[in-house]
């Protein structure tokens, strides 16, 4: 085997690369992943090889997918100049951020939990640091990213909307090297090299943040009201990623990977003290000459942990047959604690009148863990066939917990007798409530797929996946056909189409309240079935002059068995079974996507645009939300436009300059805000008798002409005034847009390569509203917007050694 053929074999079998070799006289031959005989001969002069983590280009049967390289991640301007894996995906078609500046992704109208995100083939449940500002992946450890938003191959399943496959770079088997990065928000260190040359390698990366040391003092000077930063000043994270690879022989390889990430978010206690002393005031009545003391304190503490460990064995039984087996463990834990204290004391000059002390603590915990075993075989019996087949087993454990403790004591003067004797009444109590539930979801699946070429112009990927979900007392089966097709309409134009059915056994409950959002993970039950989706897509891929590629796609997606909170449900109703708080419904989304990209040359970049709609409806018997009327999903954004352009300059043999400009526009996100006040007895007259005795958390249905279901916040002998909404997700925040610039100077020298990058986020200082809260203006309650990302310059330094 020649050296060139050995390189081809290694790349093709290692991870699905695509190679195009150009030789003399302009002749070329393209080879797709796992389809090329190792013994092929190419007579070449000077060779230039272009490779990527996955090839989803013109000649691939795959559509609705994109591959992102580490270089693209580094060139994407982001807040505080922090390279981010998921934020680079947000600039591709069909992908939207949760809010401005955050790393979470929503794909083709789907929800956050509908993304199957893997690290080296193993699932990870929480992919964010710092309340979503930073993704959980260390960019220095990433080999490549593949995002599927439709046309899913049969080897993927268990989520409805997307698959994000993040590959970790293996260590170098021959030499040591590393990378040190210093930024405004965090620092990173990555080291790789051989443990046993040519046999065992390692790759180790670590990150730590220091928001309060550099970023916060800068923001204090920028913000018009620095009090808005109090929720971030005790926020931080760190993570470690490690990969070990051992080659037993040329045919067998074992990889071990470990990831651990930790976040903390401890708000500074908010205190309020008020003292009023009227005992010596000559202008008040004698019974008003009292000294009042009132103290209130409130604090929030939260932390979350991610742990992922996997063993991955690869065996080549022949150049055409490969077996992959992966054993993994993934766990996510979230802790949230509210602490509220009240102390009141009243006295006059002679005696104590009233003393009250109360402490309330609320705690919420979520634990998700999964053990999974997957195995699949790849077989290329012919040059125009690539067969895959595999099985997977997994067991998920979901354990949500909620607890409330309340301790109070009260002493009150009730009587003063004629002789001046005092009689006090006292009351004290301790209340503790805790609810916990364990759910276990077992999943079995098997698949088969074939990527083949019936004839020259037509290429197909046909597959079938069978999946079984099982919880206590209930089992569901989902047959899932998959088909993707590519038809060449000339040498530079291809028509593509796809269909995929997907299913999902876990749900994420989300409050759509823009003022106070919340979430909770739960498994399907006998009453709440697994979610399903069917998606069709049609598109054109074109190869254009000047190294340009163009992709245009339209899609339609049907969603079934979605769940959502019923109207008016509060996220902290800990004493109510979550099954009684939710409704089951359906949804659909559709849109048009465009992407223009240039990867070669000194001028590179991409342009993407998405027009889309996403709607939900809950109108089944006993599952009515929003009066049964269709409403927009929280993930509905009509327009999403991104353009990123990078110009490379070779200033000298050792100096290089890269200038990057990126502009983004996104329609504002939707949410629900209580904007309708109901005052008794107007709407209650009809149900006055039935309303009597209603307790907090119950629902009251009003006459048909009202066509609403209202939620009662407080009830005494008669209903009190309260707020509600007319429709779900009718409030739309203003559109978000910003221009970001980055200039990176790099210098090569005998000790490695150093780079200094200056980034400016939001150049024209657009006030982009990410959230709203209730404030006051002239004693009137009004909605105020939070704009956390103003004009923000940052500096970072990187050294490769």
Regions found by a protein language model. Name each.
Residues 245-263, 299-472, 488:
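Face-selective signature of the C-terminal outer-membrane beta-barrel domain
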Residues 29-36, 46-50, 60-113, 121-140, ...:
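Periplasmic N-terminal accessory/gating domains of Gram-negative outer-membrane beta-barrel systems
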Residues 366, 370-372, 435, 525, ...:
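Outer membrane beta-barrel strand-and-loop segments of large Gram-negative receptors
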Residues 132-135, 143-153, 162-193, 201-208, ...:
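Short strand-turn segments of transmembrane beta-barrel domains in outer membranes
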Residues 183-208, 223-270, 301-323, 387:
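Transmembrane beta-barrel wall of Gram-negative outer-membrane proteins
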Residues 491-536, 556-579, 620, 662-674, ...:
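Surface-exposed extracellular loop regions of Gram-negative outer-membrane beta-barrel proteins
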Residues 556-558, 580-673, 798:
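Gram-negative outer-membrane beta-barrel transporters
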Residues 664-719, 734-740, 745-801:
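C-terminal beta-signal and adjacent terminal beta-strands/loops
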